Design a protein with these regions (language model features):
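P-loop/Walker-type NTP enzyme "switch/lid" segment
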Residues: 2-8, 27-104, 111-124
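Hydrophobic positions on the alpha1 helix immediately C-terminal to the Walker A/P-loop
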Residues: 12-13
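Active-site signature of alpha/beta-hydrolase-fold catalytic machinery across serine-
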Residues: 16, 20, 43
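Structural beta-sheet core signal
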Residues: 31, 72, 107, 130, ...
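Conserved Switch II/interswitch segment of TRAFAC-class P-loop GTPases
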Residues: 111-114, 125-142
Length: 175
């Protein structure tokens, strides 16, 4: 999951999707925070610890679940700088992701930008969700970003977030 800005709601949607999938009892879900850099990594989710991705993928020992069937991991640490630390580790761990015990792995990735690590990670994802903030994201930026993602990976969907209805509620069936 990614977006074009920090305020598009990507982390909220990623956490919500992971939580919803974990409640179906159809498998284990790993939510991975890929937002690298000081102050951007969230070591806790609802008071539960997030583990380094390498530890979450280890077969040797169990990690604590944040909720039933929901586990949390980060690629970097709060002390690490932008992308340099985590991405090398991520690519080293790729074989372990496929062999892990998790049925769903959701990546909360940094916003797309000229130097965003998300461009490099997107080809490895089974599905990309591109979050578009309805009132602030420029149409041309969306078209260019979507086209570039489609060239890298065919399975990209757009989620239109924070949409507002300005018409009467009875028109949209809200009353």
């Amino acid at each position: 999951m990614t977006s074009f800005s920090n305020a598009a709601g990507t982390s909220t949607l990623a956490a919500g999707l992971a939580s919803a999938l974990s409640e179906t009892d159809e498998g284990k879900v790993l939510l991975v925070d890929v937002n690298l850099g000081p102050g951007e990594v969230h070591p806790f989710f609802k008071g539960k610890p997030a583990y380094p991705l390498a530890k979450a993928l280890e077969q040797s020992g169990p990690i604590d679940a944040a909720a039933d069937n929901l586990y949390l991991a980060t690629i970097g640490s709060a002390k690490s700088g932008p992308a340099q630390l985590g991405l090398k580790r991520f690519f080293d761990l790729m074989p372990n992701l496929k062999a892990s015990d998790f049925d769903y792995i959701i990546f909360d990735m940094p916003p797309l930008g000229p130097t965003s690590p998300t461009w490099s990670l997107s080809p490895f994802m089974d599905k990309m969700l591109l979050i578009v903030q309805s009132d602030t994201t420029n149409k041309e930026v969306v078209n260019r970003g979507y086209s570039k993602l489609i060239r890298e990976r065919e399975n990209v969907s757009v989620v239109f977030n924070k949409a507002q209805s300005y018409g009467p509620k009875w028109i949209s069936g809200e009353e």
